[in-house]
Amino acid sequence: MKGTSALLLIGFFHATISQDPGGTVVIGSLSGRKRGNLNTGGQITSNSAILGDVNAGSKLSEPPKRRNTDKTARMLENNPRIGGSLIPPPGVIMEPNPYDINPPYFVSNKNSQSTNSATNTMLQSLTSDTKTTTRTSQTSSTRASSSITQGINTMNRNSMRFNQVDRNKISGFVNSGGQIQTNPLNTNSQSSPILAAQRQITRQKSENTQGNSIVRNGGTNSLNIPSSTRRSQPPNMAVQIGQNTATFNMGTDGKVLHKFLPTNLFENINSVSKEPRNTASVPGIGGMRNPGPSISIRNIFGTNNIEGSSVQLTGSSGVFVSDPGPKGNPTDVPQFVPSGISPTVRDPNALDPFKSIRNQIVPDIKRNEVNRGNSMISAPVIDNPTNSNSMVELNSILQNVQNGFLSEALGNSNNQNNRVTNIVNQINSADPQPVRRCQFLPYRDLRTNKIDRRYFRQLVNGKWLNLKCADGAGFNETTCLCSIHLTGDAQCSPEVRLNFNDGTIQNLTPINVHIDAEGVDASKGWAHFNGSTQMKFEYFNAYDVQRDFLIKLRFKADSYIPNQSHPIVTNCVAGQENTDPSIGVFLTGNYPHKIVFILQTDKSKLLQHLIFDVPRDGWHDITYKYDGSTLTGILDGKEKSLPTEGRIENRQAVLVFGGCGNRIFRGNIDDIQIYTCIPPSHRNKG
């Protein structure tokens, strides 16, 4: 690239980059005004528009001296803290983060405290000689029609490229919203205006760590981040913390997932996933494979950078999560999960957050659109951005880029990898832009006060409904999906469970199941049927059971009617006695009495059945099971089975206990369990 120039695009701005034969990269505006130089091979020069420069080579330069230190201090003092972000997001103010101990300084205008969109936000740079104001375009509605390529291009020590640049100016290092103020973190100069301003602020407000003041510990080494300053509590912000991720929320139409795997961020978080990296995905539920450590930008900037921490960006249309590929592969891209995906049974056509985005929603990524002829990291394209969210996302991307340069500079210059990791992860943990709340809540069992992840809650028409995840999956409030892999019997739980112990007829599972049991008496701890009462489950009305189905119960018959069958449980159609049910357990009235299990599938021409002799008196345990290939019946521990295939035929009927139509049952039923899956404990036996 010697002696050439290339057009860069970041956000809605234009600028040029040129590189002289000596290796100095100059970033400037179309007007020719230089904002700062980046030398990937040596020292960085600076001018009045940049307070401190980042050197990606072997030496960090010190910022130029400023004459008006008092003014600098006042501006620093009066400007809000935005989570210690290197790039203050346009129009978004973040609350102070208690983990934000000593991040690099930045400056923003008080106007940025408003919630105006990025097109109405102005950020004022901090200089003593020149007041430089970055103005966003007044014709943003027109420029918003152009697409933003959201991503991070390949960077190394010989080249620096970005996808989009502000069409008016580049202010500072890499920033589409305003001036970036970056401190050299190894300066001990007593004349540094930053340190002078810091000492003055510290003297005035040594105890104040909240509000809009920027307060530091003071001293020449105040910009170091010792590990001893870690706190044991999570950040004081809207955040949901999972085992390996945190979801930050600030209510601007989305959310950001932040992977904070490094141990230096939270003491109880491991830097490496304990699960196997390539755990096989379980079909039908999606998101089951443990992703392992985040790729972050480590694979982009080399080996001396961030150890496993990254920000996954979002837009109004969904959430990005990480999909690490082979170690060191720099072509991994964020994976996209649409916000409309329900955490219930996954549609086979729905996007899988752990499969390649290129094969799902962006099959035609223009890999060389900006960097023609050169390799670049592919990323989704956001078309027609019309609000500040796109700018917030873009700023977050650019910040990751700058963090990479910062990490590279410190790693090469001081060879303090741990310090680099601490600094960059503190920055990353402080500034993700939360954008959307999860519309579901985990289900908490009020009896045990424990969360049961097999279920989740959704607010529908002002009422909370309890819903069930797909079999084998558990609800994860961080991903807002049923993305947890359950093991053991937790893989399969009953839709309905009744024991009548308290004299009431109530489903003991979290699922909202209406039970019509008028006249059924449960006062003795079981359900009593007198021959004119039934218990109906509308939940299974025309229910498409398909294959897996299991019912367990206990019964005791009081009387029998010769030449008549007594339905204990069926899905028979009332008023259509000539239509056989496709599911049923019957007791015959003739002596010797028998129990009959019946099944009708779409592939069986005849009604399949199993017959057991049953003693006249006493309680009896029965289990009815069909797993798609075998009908199994169990009576008091005795098991019979019949090979059968096909799906259970649907009936436009509810599931009924205690009779159907003119067929009645007199007796007691207890301990009812209904499954639409086969629990592991019943897979190799009845």
Swiss-Prot record:
Tissue specificity note: Prismatic layer of shell (at protein level). Expressed primarily in the mantle with highest level in the mantle edge and lower level in the mantle pallium.
Keyword Signal included in the entry's annotation: yes
Listed GO CC annotations: extracellular region
Biased composition (Basic and acidic residues): 62-73
Localization: Secreted
Region (Disordered): 34-73, 125-148, 201-236
Keywords: Secreted, Signal
Start-end of Polar residues biased regions: 37-49
Highest rank taxon of the organism: Eukaryota
Primary site of residence: secreted
Residue stretches in coiled coil: none
Signal sequence segment: 1-18
Record InterPro entries: ConA-like_dom_sf
Protein name: Asparagine-rich protein
Organism: Margaritifera margaritifera
